[in-house]
Design a protein with these regions (language model features):
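Adenosine-phosphate binding glycine-rich loop
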Residues: 2-22, 27, 222, 336-447
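Rossmann-like adenosine-cofactor binding region
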Residues: 266-366, 371
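General beta-strand structural signal in soluble alpha/beta enzymes
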Residues: 162-166, 190-194, 237, 260-263, ...
Length: 447
């Protein structure tokens, strides 16, 4: 049976193979829906079972992690590493620690990462990993013991030319350091096998800022192409972690008035807009073990919408930076009715397919995460380059390279998604990333 004779038959094939992996199926549907007209015009990409190979990870590693907590009780977690596609380079993608982590989510993230990494023009394949371990409320000793226990299995599957993980939700510089240290201990090798490391042992300047900065660089390029800009715009940001914090900082530098931030408990609204002082305090509060956005709102006398997302606040630009599927169709309708001009994804797939369709139908500029938030992995690639050369670049050089890469990604999206009146960035990003990966797979034969 030819699964690629139509879009629906191919999506049914994916669903039938993994019927309980809804997040992965959603990611495949989003990509293939925009790709299919291009595939019909270029049938060579449907030969040699290329599409079937593209949606099947090269390797999935699942393992048990046993560790001892502060009460001397043995705890058991599950962990995975999805090595999705290495056609253009070693597997590259973050590690996520969160109770919601499962194989479907990691396959979706690895699939998206494959195209995102291709868009950066750097030689990196796609992968993703993580565990259902929850670092919230854990002591530093517990986090360290978990990371070290995880690496006793994972280390054998990593290497600078094989698989180079990084951080993600629940995995910051501390966790990366613990894992990188244990990797060095077990392998007796100090080669670069993690990015997002501390500056004292091979990290890169601008890496913590890169995803948020890159998001704003891409969004500014998108706005400029359509006669707009951040200057004077009201901006809603969701989330209050790393990506959100640096997106707020860079948007402020571009002249925007950022009026929201959020966490899992609610949203803070600041009609006057963030200032450098307020942002610094937000970062301090969120860095504490039990930091809550409600405390920040109370300190500055701001409105706090408990249990609410930021999408009901009238804004010109929305930057979802929290988690997948946070912006649904109802939220999209509210934003559209309030006159939103642009939406750019700082998180991975934070916008549902229905919401994305509504934005595109309404003529709202929409930047998908695989393009807009590629700055983090792009700077990870720059960190790998610095490690390989045994060099460290100045912050200005890394930032300039990041800005250049984001403009290149924007150019690729326009090349494949350009239209007379408005660029379809979803189509452009999907086709541009697909073509690079597919050409590499075809060139390497059936393997």
């Amino acid at each position: 049976m030819d699964q690629t004779r139509s879009l629906e038959s191919f999506l049914a094939y994916v669903q039938q193979r993994d019927p309980h992996q809804s997040e992965f199926a959603q990611a495949v549907r989003e990509v293939m829906t925009t790709l299919w007209p291009f595939l019909e015009e270029n049938p060579r990409y449907r030969q040699l079972s290329l599409l079937e190979r593209l949606v099947e990870p090269e390797r999935v590693i699942q393992f048990r992690v046993t560790w001892v907590d502060d009460r001397n009780q043995v705890q058991v977690n599950r962990a995975w590493r999805v090595q999705f596609n290495s056609a253009i380079g070693p597997f590259k993608g973050g590690m996520r620690f969160h109770p919601s982590v499962n194989l479907s989510i990691l396959k979706f993230l690895g699939f998206e990462q494959t195209f995102k990494n291709a868009l950066t023009t750097l030689p990196m394949g796609g992968g993703k990993g993580g565990s259902d371990f929850d670092p919230k409320g854990k002591s530093e000793g517990e986090v360290m013991r978990f990371c070290q226990a995880l690496m006793t299995e994972l280390y054998r599957h990593l290497g600078p030319d094989t698989d180079v993980p990084a951080g993600d939700i629940g995995v910051g510089g501390r966790e990366v350091g613990f894992m990188a240290g244990m990797m060095k201990k077990l392998s007796n090798n100090s080669a670069c096998v993690f990015t997002g490391k501390g500056l004292s042992f091979g990290g890169s300047l601008i890496r913590p800022e890169a995803t948020g900065y890159g998001l704003v660089y891409f969004t500014e390029a998108m706005l400029k192409r359509h006669g707009l800009g951040f200057e004077g715009m009201r901006v809603a940001v969701s989330g209050s972690g790393n990506v959100a914090q640096y997106a707020i900082e860079k948007a402020m530098q571009f002249g925007a008035r950022v009026v929201t931030a959020s966490d899992s408990k609610g949203t803070v609204v600041d009609e006057a807009g963030f200032t450098a002082e307020k942002l610094a305090r937000l970062c301090e509060i969120k860095a504490s073990r039990d930091g809550r956005l409600a405390d920040y709102a109370a300190e500055f006398g701001l409105t706090y919408l408990e249990g609410k997302q930021p999408w009901g606040v009238p804004v010109d630009i929305a930057l979802p930076c929290a988690t997948q599927n946070e912006l649904d169709a109802d939220a999209a309708r509210t934003l559209i009715s309030n006159g939103v001009k642009a939406v750019a994804e700082g998180a991975n797939m934070p916008t549902t397919i229905e919401a994305t369709d509504l934005f595109l139908e309404a003529g709202v500029l929409f930047a998908p995460g695989k393009a807009a938030n590629a700055g983090g992995v792009a700077t990870s690639g720059l960190e790998m380059a610095q490690n390989a050369a045994r060099l460290g670049w100045k912050a200005e050089k890394v930032d300039a390279r990041l800005h250049h890469i984001m403009l290149d990604i924007h150019h690729a999206c326009v090349e494949y998604g350009g239209e007379a009146s408005q660029t379809n960035y979803v189509r452009g990003a999907n086709i541009a990333g697909f073509v690079k990966v597919a050409d590499a797979m075809i060139g390497q034969g059936v393997i």
